[in-house]
Amino acid sequence: MKLLSLTGVAGVLATCVAATPLVKRLPSGSDPAFSQPKSVLDAGLTCQGASPSSVSKPILLVPGTGTTGPQSFDSNWIPLSTQLGYTPCWISPPPFMLNDTQVNTEYMVNAITALYAGSGNNKLPVLTWSQGGLVAQWGLTFFPSIRSKVDRLMAFAPDYKGTVLAGPLDALAVSAPSVWQQTTGSALTTALRNAGGLTQIVPTTNLYSATDEIVQPQVSNSPLDSSYLFNGKNVQAQAVCGPLFVIDHAGSLTSQFSYVVGRSALRSTTGQARSADYGITDCNPLPANDLTPEQKVAAAALLAPAAAAIVAGPKQNCEPDLMPYARPFAVGKRTCSGIVTP
């Protein structure tokens, strides 16, 4: 996909995203009730070599669409975060993050609560890829209890505003539930925007690429980009590395450049990556240097299992209904049950 052809994509989103957030006050009060039993949510959380109920320095990894936690991170941030001194933990909402994003979020919220308690009430970082970033921001927006438990958010290729490239799948009625929700202008992304979720809630770094073949628009290095959050540290790879630098959706997670930015974010005293920690000399699109040869091979093929899962996974012909707590923020949008009302 050529960069020039993507430039016009930004115009599509311009009518969907205002220059400033529409609502600045986040939802407050008690968390919404989970739709899933706690035992089911607990079963979706795993820590490397530790129990979530007793874990030292955890980092929560939230995977992308079409994958489990290990499929997203075995070849990259599970070993890399271990090298940085963390105990990696991850969620794997079934099936392969293809279900309702709101349900996927419940797995993350439950995991944060468990890991916070299991580490002695210590805040923890959350690191995400693709839909995982949307899940994290949805959770921080609508589940107030976790805001004080999350130390920082490092999001690789998040689609906070969805992607215009999901539209053709929706039109053919061959989209998974979460793909419907990740379409630009969906009820879910509208609710996130209107609830104040396009502004960082915890210290946040977003790393993304103009040449992403899955999430667009990402070309403007501005609030029009799907991965951009107000007040966040927004790092478009091409803004640092130049317009000819190419990393795809997977490379936004696995590349050496992504590792340097992510490492800075995790080490920073502010919770955001520091511009002084990365530059043109770090602009290597290949998998991170500190990975083994086997991990580098797996990282380079990261999208293959995701694509296979999406093709074989559940399909439906409409966007899942919003949970009651989110409906007031997307009045007038259409979901499976019809037009959203408060």
UniProtKB/Swiss-Prot annotation:
Species annotation: Pseudozyma antarctica
Catalytic activity line of the entry: a triacylglycerol + H2O = a diacylglycerol + a fatty acid + H(+)
InterPro entries: AB_hydrolase_fold, Stereospecific_Lipase
SUPFAM superfamilies: alpha/beta-Hydrolases (SSF53474)
The keyword Signal belongs to this UniProt entry's keyword annotation: yes
GO biological process: lipid catabolic process
Glycosylation site list: 99
Keyword terms, alphabetized: Cleavage on pair of basic residues, Disulfide bond, Glycoprotein, Hydrolase, Lipid degradation, Lipid metabolism, Signal, Zymogen
Job of this protein: Hydrolysis of triglycerides. Is very stereospecific both in hydrolysis and in organic synthesis and has a potentially important application in glucolipid synthesis.
Keyword Signal in annotation: yes
SS bond list: 47-89, 241-283, 318-336
E.C. code: 3.1.1.3
Enzyme class: hydrolase
Propeptide: 19-25
Active site residues per record: 130, 212, 249
GO molecular function, one term: triacylglycerol lipase activity
Signal peptide: 1-18
Protein name in the entry: Lipase B
